[in-house]
Amino acid sequence: PLGNPGGTFCGLVRLPVKGRDILIYSNCDTPGGNRENVTVWASFDGAQTWPIKRSVYKPVSAYSSLTAGRPGTASEGTICILFEGGKAFRHEGAFAASFNLSWVLGGERTGDGEVPKWVATK
């Protein structure tokens, strides 16, 4: 996303929603490129804009990876993130979290585009 100082320790996944181009991006979101505050951003237009983001883990952290559940399975609609983190050192351990798009939509607006009405009204 525009202005993200996080570098390349990120994850990216396209959600398997027929007829929609929804991307979820993960990275650290701190000034100066510090490795803290693992955050996910959502794009609804193929990465042209990233109008919403939500913090997953605020302490020190590092590399992250994303995956999305498969249609027609129990995992459908689930987004999973695996990332490095810790209380004092970013490589203390590996952490995992799962959430859905509705959870991301509860985050903060970035000012980079708008959340489409077809998403906001669901």
Question: Could you describe each region identified by the protein language model?
Answer:
Residues 1-122:
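Asp-box/BNR beta-propeller blade signature and adjacent active/binding-site loops
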